[in-house]
Amino acid sequence: MAKAMCSLGACLAVMLVVLAAAVAGVGCSIVSYDGRSLILDGERRIVISGSIHYPRSTPEMWPDLIKKAKEGGLNAIETYVFWNGHEPRRREFNFEGNYDVVRFFKEIQNAGMYAILRIGPYICGEWNYGGLPVWLRDIPGIKFRLHNKPFENGMEAFTTLIVKKMKDANMFAGQGGPIILAQIENEYGYTMLQPENIQSAHEYIHWCADMANKQNVGVPWIMCQQDNDVPPNVVNTCNGFYCHEWFSNRTSIPKMWTENWTGWYRDWDQPEFRRPTEDIAFAVAMFFQMRGSLQNYYMYHGGTNFGRTAGGPYITTSYDYDAPLDEYGNLRQPKYGHLKELHSVLMSMEKILLHGDYIDTNYGDNVTVTKYTLNATSACFINNRFDDRDVNVTLDGTTHFLPAWSVSILPNCKTVAFNSAKIKTQTTVMVNKTSMVEQQTEHFKWSWMPENLRPFMTDEKGNFRKNELLEQIVTTTDQSDYLWYRTSLEHKGEGSYVLYVNTTGHELYAFVNGKLVGQQYSPNENFTFQLKSPNYGGSFELLPAGIVGGPVKLIDSSGSAIDLSNNSWSYKAGLAGEYRKIYLDKPGNKWRSHNSTIPINRPFTWYKTTFQAPAGEDSVVVDLHGLNKGVAWVNGNSLGRYWPSYVAADMPGCHHCDYRGVFKAEVEAQKCLTGCGEPSQQLYHVPRSFLNKGEPNTLILFEEAGGDPSEVAVRTVVEGSVCASAEVGDTVTLSCGAHGRTISSVDVASFGVARGRCGSYDGGCESKVAYDAFAAACVGKESCTVLVTDAFANAGCVSGVLTVQATC
């Protein structure tokens, strides 16, 4: 990820990219490259990749996600390898469940796809501590991502472990496997430019390259976003929203784009960024126009930050990322379909793009025609980089209209096969389905249990003391979000005091004599709160969390302060319920049941209920409306942190999204934002593999701040409305997805300027002929295709574009 994507520290892990063959099956054994592209068994190849992170989904989801990616025209999948997930405690390894990285690669190979193994150790990725295991901090003398033996020894050991696992499974190309590239380090050039680190960084990055090449994997090694000080034995690549202007500083290296950001992550306190489909298509088309040969969508499927894996600060549990496949694995239309059409056109031009001669011709400012020629064939790109005007371009006697901020692709230099701004694919609006399960809500029988605070209010076993305020991550060894600080003083005066705490904690709860006297979340600069460990930067092992150093003061009404920072402090990490693993619902837990009411708005409370799994295969979510802040589990599986009470800022420009112009993931840009004034996240993914079929499922909540579980509901996410626009001569295809849902009605068939957006269109010039045609072809069907003809037009309609909306 880029610098803006991660807030604080360096990140660590392994990133893997998986590349699908353009033909069925894989069999590449010799991998090389030249200045134009990768060369696989002697053939130059275009690679179109997409990121899918295996721990952000489940093994049961992997085959379907990979299948959809391949059907979307990808010939690559990318993923990080997550060190702190695989080695949470030193020399204790986890390669089970959704951390079974070898199984994930085998699923990709089974789909007929190649793989690129990107080994960090740095990943960022909005992942807890950037993928670094926290125990690294305990190694004497360690400095992250600089030239020093403690860090390099740990990095080499983990890199060697991952390489060995891949070799043992015959995953490298020379073994008949899918891996055709490997990466060491990640985005190092973003963070390590401090003057005092230049020499150490230089030695470290060259050590990385040498260490990687000694692994003898038989494929080239890459470094992404490494434009400065590139070692001679690696290939550097580009990351960003746009990479058409980027070229390697060595002409022998092909132009490769390892992270094309399809959207953006979401913070708890911010609206959601939506990168327009037209803009992504524009960026990809421009990249290949300007000699690109490999590009990867980050993300193609974002998934979910289950458990405590969300990085910081403020990253939500959902890692949807506005990707072509949504958090649950559903197609996000039109993004998925429009890019699929682009991929098809690009792959049809593979030979001429990678072997042909080319010439760029400027047609004034911001308009460029690129013509590729090979033997007697030619292919052309025309781009219009103006963000405020359409243009007409005459090429070989034919005039072509280009909307602003768009690229047209002409595989024969005569006929436009694709324009990035003209979307023909349907738009799908997903909705929360009212189902029998949702109707169970009023019948949920809740039981509850107070969190036992006694161990933290007294100096019981497990506590330890220090005459200083300690750093939270080290003290908890990152095994819990919660750290208790306790001190005592003799108060002889009268009157009231204000407790002042300078902390990098995310939320603070204050107790006096065992009673909760207040809680506070502070997003302002007086308190720098964060939800999880930092995950971006250089020497971020030095960046503190918690009430480290303080000060902690009691301030009386006169302004006099008692500084408690150097008092004797007692510490204990975690919750009693965490130690007892209440979330596993073991026998012996003393749940309290109430026939009619349960305590609400009570901090530090556990709740439990049961529900039946919804029928079918639609995506399942739990709606936590009414709750405040905490953690949720289903059948012992952590859904992650929840915070539905945190409402995103309401700001000007929300919901306004003009695709034209440079996309920036900045709230200040006030462009392409949604969810303003709404909960940052209210729905939490429950993968089908978490659920028991035909048996009760247990939902357990730990509510830390006090909420009302009576409004909690289990829902399914399904296609609601499907819409499309097309000109005469085009075909319109509408589909209600792959789970047997059918089109129930046609709502709008307008051959004019339809007002509104998909799901709420108001036809401006209704066409009865078009309506009847779509009703006859579509109602009662899972999908339908209709040819748009002149007969659909109405006299007096201004626009020649048909807009249709149907309900699933």
From Swiss-Prot:
GO BP annotations, alphabetical order: galactose catabolic process; plant-type cell wall modification
Active site, per annotation: E187 (proton donor), E259 (nucleophile)
Residues carrying covalently attached carbohydrate according to the record: N249, N260, N366, N375, N392, N432, N502, N526, N566, N595
EC numbers for this chain: 3.2.1.23
InterPro entries: BetaGal_gal-bd (IPR048913), Galactose-bd-like_sf (IPR008979), GHD (IPR041392), Gly_Hdrlase_35_cat (IPR031330), Glyco_hydro_35_CS (IPR019801), Glycoside_Hdrlase_35 (IPR001944), Glycoside_hydrolase_SF (IPR017853), Lectin_gal-bd_dom (IPR000922)
Signal peptide location: 1-28
Record has Amino-acid biosynthesis as a keyword: no
UniProt keywords, alphabetically: Apoplast, Glycoprotein, Glycosidase, Hydrolase, Secreted, Signal
Catalytic activity line of the entry: Hydrolysis of terminal non-reducing beta-D-galactose residues in beta-D-galactosides
Compartments it resides in: Secreted, Extracellular space, Apoplast
A Gene Ontology molecular function term of the record: carbohydrate binding
Primary localization class, coarse: secreted
All copies of domain SUEL-type lectin, residue ranges: 726-808
Family: Belongs to the glycosyl hydrolase 35 family.
Name of protein: Beta-galactosidase 14
Organism in which the protein naturally occurs: Oryza sativa subsp. japonica (Rice)
Lineage: Eukaryota, Viridiplantae, Streptophyta, Embryophyta, Tracheophyta
